[in-house]
From Swiss-Prot:
Encoding gene, per UniProt annotation: uvrB
Protein known as: UvrABC system protein B
Family of this protein: Belongs to the UvrB family.
Function comment: The UvrABC repair system catalyzes the recognition and processing of DNA lesions. A damage recognition complex composed of 2 UvrA and 2 UvrB subunits scans DNA for abnormalities. Upon binding of the UvrA(2)B(2) complex to a putative damaged site, the DNA wraps around one UvrB monomer. DNA wrap is dependent on ATP binding by UvrB and probably causes local melting of the DNA helix, facilitating insertion of UvrB beta-hairpin between the DNA strands. Then UvrB probes one DNA strand for the presence of a lesion.
Domain Helicase ATP-binding: from-to ranges: 31-188
GO molecular function, one term: ATP binding
Keywords, ordered alphabetically: ATP-binding, Cytoplasm, DNA damage, DNA excision, DNA repair, Excision nuclease, Helicase, Hydrolase, Nucleotide-binding, SOS response
Species in which this protein is naturally found: Streptococcus pneumoniae (strain CGSP14)
Domain named Helicase C-terminal: residues: 435-601
PANTHER family registered for this protein in UniProt: UVRABC SYSTEM PROTEIN B
Keyword RNA-binding (UniProt): no
GO biological process: nucleotide-excision repair; SOS response
Subunit details: Forms a heterotetramer with UvrA during the search for lesions. Interacts with UvrC in an incision complex.
Residues engaged in binding ATP: 44-51
Length: 662
């Protein structure tokens, strides 16, 4: 049984008060939500404090909230901001837990089968479990997610029904508890104690929940009765306190009980027989043999272990769904009356709409060639209309809402005034003749004032050539391309802010979510080449990159002024006029945003210093090793707090290496 607390209130903590046009935006959004309006748009210019407005709305309507961003970087930024605004509430993070993911696929032209290959990030997996367990235990929950939240996740009912509920005085034998833990995919390991594992020492069972990373629980028995339950530090065993109730959630989201498993296996076998008959009738003997061998192996694993690699491909049978019925997703873990906020909706909605088709075409190939049963097609993302059916109330948040959002609602709430008084930048158009030398002069002027420059090009070659040329001219410049990993991208942005280099060149990486107040110049090359990157919305987003600096200026290099350029220039001028009038009326002088540079790499340097010392861990005594483990654990937590999970995993491995010597 789960103790679900429903009377928690969101408590917003901030040293700021709503200002500019934030108060009216907050009031309108809240009134519309409380009035039952299903959809509305918050059209907030860059730098107007949309996240703060979202936080104010969440605290006032007091509903569990799902915030969807279109990539992990943005989700990470939002997660950090919401954690600061709501330190006493459950702010959770739910993104794909793969560091690396190669989906299962088959290429008929070369008869190549590509087996699923992936590397799961343990820290993100922990955060996903933390999100689902929080949703079932309390109502004051904000989950910041990427679009992976519309992928199949397993039945929330099975997940909740499988919870092992413990309290002092409960009559249950130690062996029964051990069996219950194994049933929900916990693993016994008396030596390497990690998330999703338990260990046994006489009448004491220690359990490490899948949603925790440092605290475990010690269940002490007296005969066949639980005597007491203590929360302990997993690493040191130090007792932190006693608890009167403990809910242990499954170690995997794909979980089912024995009765349902037998029914599911029977359905899998029946489907296998049907599909084998189809293949044999069509003379596809190789495909039939392939399917029979693979499926029978999976069935055996499900019978013996309750789990198999690729178990999600059988989720339709395990969940008891009909063919074509949508899968369970994170959205099903929310109560009926919840709020969805879609950040940068002009980008995120496109992803939600496109996920299903890409997944379907790949899976059909696997089914047609005997690598998977047809039911694997129902392990999929939601279709757009299925996502819409989950929507109770939704707020689309964007500086440039797309056509879809505008079709869903006519309620558009503008947020144009920046609390800092900053204006939208001035935009000018210059000819392409001599543009590179002209731009070089502008960059040098910014470098002298310790300001930064963004340059956006249309092609990779242009970006590379431009970067090489500016380097030859003595400019400190970097090119950010699409192959750069998320963590490296974050480091590049930080180095730009610190002045390690002055100019960043990119193609489609500079439009939203990159927050660099030091940038005073944005140069848009080939601004008159109509297309996805040079349409009205794309240009407005790019212009917005210079809106966090009081000296913000945008130069479009073009030989003609396209309709998209003109509309973007006109909209920027309209906003600038409103902002100037507000500043004049209230005596506000625009100030460049002073934003703390979060030291994402501080922990890396700390570890590097430790490594530089070349400590021979074999030469350390037990007390010194214990102190080193404590130091590493602290560094690991610091890495997790800034979402540097790759580094956290490296530190964890170092810790295990040290602990293995004891």
């Amino acid at each position: 049984m789960i103790n679900h607390i429903t009377d928690n209130q969101f408590k917003l903590v901030s040293k700021y008060q709503p200002s500019g046009d934030q108060p009216q935006a907050i009031e309108q959004l809240v009134d519309n939500i409380e009035g039952g309006e299903k959809a509305q748009i918050l059209m907030g210019a860059t730098g107007t404090g949309k996240t703060y407005t979202m936080s104010q709305v969440i605290s006032k309507v007091n509903k569990p909230t799902l915030v969807i961003a279109h990539n992990k970087t943005l989700a990470g930024q939002l997660y950090g901001e919401f954690k600061e605004f709501f330190p006493e509430n459950a702010v959770e993070y739910f993104v794909s837990y793969y560091d690396y993911y190669q989906p299962e696929a088959y290429v008929p032209s070369s008869d190549t089968y590509i087996e699923k290959d992936s590397s799961v990030n343990d820290e993100i997996d922990k955060l996903r479990h933390s999100a689902t367990s929080a949703l079932l235990e309390r109502n004051d929950v904000i989950v910041v997610a990427s679009v992976s939240c519309i992928y199949g996740l397993g039945s929330p009912k099975e997940y909740a029904d499988s919870v092992v509920s413990l309290r002092p005085g409960l009559e249950i034998s130690r062996d029964k508890l051990l069996n219950d833990l194994v049933d929900i995919q916990f693993e016994r390991n008396d030596i390497d104690f990690q998330r999703g594992r338990f260990r046994v020492r006489g009448d004491v069972v220690e359990i490490f929940p899948a949603s925790r990373d440092e605290h475990a629980f010690r269940v002490e028995f007296f005969g066949d009765e639980i005597d007491r339950i203590r929360e302990v530090e997993a690493l040191t065993g130090q007792v932190l306190g006693e608890v009167d109730h403990l809910a242990i959630f499954p170690a995997t989201h794909f979980v089912t009980n024995d009765d349902h498993m037998e029914v599911a296996i029977a359905k899998i076998q029946a489907e296998l027989e049907e599909q084998l008959a189809v293949f044999e009738k069509e003379g596809k003997l190789l495909e039939a043999q392939r399917l029979k061998q693979r499926t029978e192996y999976d069935i055996e694993m499900l019978r013996e272990m309750g789990y198999t690699n690729g178990v999600e491909n059988y989720s339709r049978h395990m969940d008891g769904r009909s063919e074509g019925e949508p899968p369970y997703t994170l959205l099903d873990f929310f109560p009926d009356d919840f709020l969805i906020m879609i950040d940068e909706s002009h980008m995120t909605i496109g992803q939600i709409k496109g996920m299903y088709n890409g997944d379907r075409s790949r899976k059909e190939m696997l089914v047609n060639y005997g690598f998977r049963l047809p039911s694997a097609l129902d392990n999929r993302p939601l279709r757009r209309e299925e996502f819409e059916s989950h929507v109770h109330q939704i707020v689309y948040v964007s500086a440039t809402p797309g056509d879809y959002e505008n079709e869903q609602t006519e309620t558009v709430i503008e947020q144009i005034i920046r609390p800092t008084g900053l204006l939208d930048p001035e935009v000018e158009v210059r000819p392409t003749m001599g543009q590179i030398d002209d731009l070089l002069g502008e960059i040098n002027a910014r470098v002298e004032k310790n300001e930064r420059t963004f340059i956006t090009t249309l092609t990779k070659k242009m970006a590379e050539d431009l970067t090489d040329y500016f380097k030859e001219m003595g400019i400190k410049v970097k090119y950010m391309h699409s192959d750069i990993k998320t963590l490296e991208r974050t480091e590049i942005i930080r180095d730009l802010r610190l002045g390690v280099f002055d100019v960043l060149v990119g193609i489609n990486l500079l439009r939203e979510g990159i927050d660099v107040p030091e940038v005073s110049l944005v140069a848009i090359l080939d601004a008159d080449k109509e297309g996805f990157l040079r349409n009205e919305r794309g240009l407005i987003q790019t212009i917005g990159r210079a809106a966090r600096n009081s000296e913000g200026h945008v130069i479009m290099y073009a030989d003609t002024v396209t309709q998209s350029m003109q509309r973007a220039i006109d909209e920027t001028a309209r906003r600038r006029k409103i902002q100037m009038a507000y500043n004049e009326e209230h005596g506000i002088v625009p100030q460049t945003i002073k934003k703390e540079i979060r030291d994402l790499i501080a922990v890396t340097k700390a570890v590097a210093k430790e490594e530089d010392k070349e400590v021979d861990i074999n030469s350390l005594n037990k007390q010194e090793r214990k102190e080193l483990v404590k130091k590493l654990e602290k560094q690991m937590q610091e890495a997790v707090e800034v979402l540097d999970f790759e580094l956290a995993a490296q530190i964890r491995d170092m810790m295990l290496e040290v602990k293995a010597l004891d």
